[in-house]
Amino acid sequence: MGKTLYEKVWEAHEVRKLKNGQSQLFIDLHLLHEVTSPQAFGMLKDLGLRVRYPHRTFATVDHIVPTHDRTEPFQDPLAQSMLEALRANTREHGITFFDLGSGNQGIVHVIGPQLGLTQPGMTIACGDSHTSTHGAFGAVAFGIGTSQVRDVLATQTLAAQKLKVRRINVEGRLAPGVYAKDVILHIIRHLGVKGGLGYAYEYGGSAVEAMDMESRMTLCNMSIEGGARIGYVNPDETTFQYLEGRPYVPKGSEWEEAKRRWLAWRSDPDASYDDVVTFRAEEIAPTVTWGITPGQAIPIDGRIPLLEELPEEERPVAEEALAYMGFRPGQPIKGVPIQVAFIGSCTNARLSDLREVARYLKGHKVKKGVRALVVPGSEWVARKAEEEGIAEVFREAGFEWRMPGCSMCLAMNPDRLEGDELCASSSNRNYKGRMGSPRGRTVLMSPLMVAAAAVAGEIADAREVFGLAGVR
């Protein structure tokens, strides 16, 4: 019987089985940021321990950094202290740190792949829930807590429970104006925010195989919103084309050997799965959320569900969502006014995201009264976008072009909603208060849909705003 990629990677990295049913796994790559690492380093110091393998550990600053004015000290003294702590800890332990202005600073899940640190067959850990992003390369990537960050720093291992594997096939061809963000929202809408509990998700099928790497990253990024701890795609030629020539990947003859080695991680044709689910790409439309979980999503031309249409166990959360969002059952989502538009986050702030939006945004203007921000995922992305004229397209349209960071995705920096503002967002979470205001509202969608909402001043169909029919 064949094995899945997940099983192969697990077995190759299993140091030992633990008495509690978990396994101790060797971690190939440990990524750090400023929020979940200070306490971990503090615990390490209290125990009198050093970082076990500094050369397998890399750090950046992303969550707390201002994206408008980076003059130090920051206005927020806590943010400044977290940055200073990361600088001191990485310096003390000999860890590579991509600091502000280094040319490689950015959102941790953007810079890992961008630098070629993320590679097929790896086990990867980071103190951030969206570490599943790296699974797009055929890696098994764990989002971990602070005490586990300490464990990996000290031992380069992680205690973990082996998961079941669900294969999610997306077959067919996506229509113009439909992107990976729509695919993952569609999947979560149908499988639920708890549907992936206890599972690793393996994404495949012709639509996934046709995706570029940055689209696959979007898909894997939001596995966690569907309840799965792990999401991955089998490595292929698309993976190799993306990785070739990046700073941390093998070069020359070692590159050819690496590709042969990486292909061996692919799930075997006769691998057995605990569950298989198939979706048709042609049935997926531009999708947006209407509530307070990513699973509360509908096609752009749909209506918010009537309570009686929902399973009984979903009705209390739906009622809570309707009250919080100020929506009513049966209401069309299209046409709802927005006050803020945000393109950014570890889900959708890569160069391909910005290129695609700029392609259609050129010649359009942000609606008066809408505050629109675009926040590149890294200094490299920002630099390339400037070189290609992408940044200027956004500026001309009326978007604020910001510096890299997590920005509005979470309320840990100055980019926040005010009052009950409604934000059309390319991020990954629409929880109550997620964007800083206890009454702020978030509607998740693809970057192009965010741009369409910014131009229209309301939630809109990008295919109509930008005339996408028959394009691509």
From Swiss-Prot:
GO terms for biological process: L-leucine biosynthetic process. HAMAP family: LeuC_type1 (MF_01026). Its cofactor is [4Fe-4S] cluster. Keywords: 4Fe-4S, Amino-acid biosynthesis, Branched-chain amino acid biosynthesis, Iron, Iron-sulfur, Leucine biosynthesis, Lyase, Metal-binding. The keyword Metal-binding applies. This is 3-isopropylmalate dehydratase large subunit. SUPFAM superfamilies: Aconitase iron-sulfur domain (SSF53732). The gene is leuC. Its EC number is 4.2.1.33. Gene3D superfamilies: Aconitase, domain 3. It is an enzyme of class 4 (lyase). Disulfide bonds: none annotated. Heterodimer of LeuC and LeuD. Coiled coil: none annotated. The keyword Iron applies. Binds 1 [4Fe-4S] cluster per subunit.
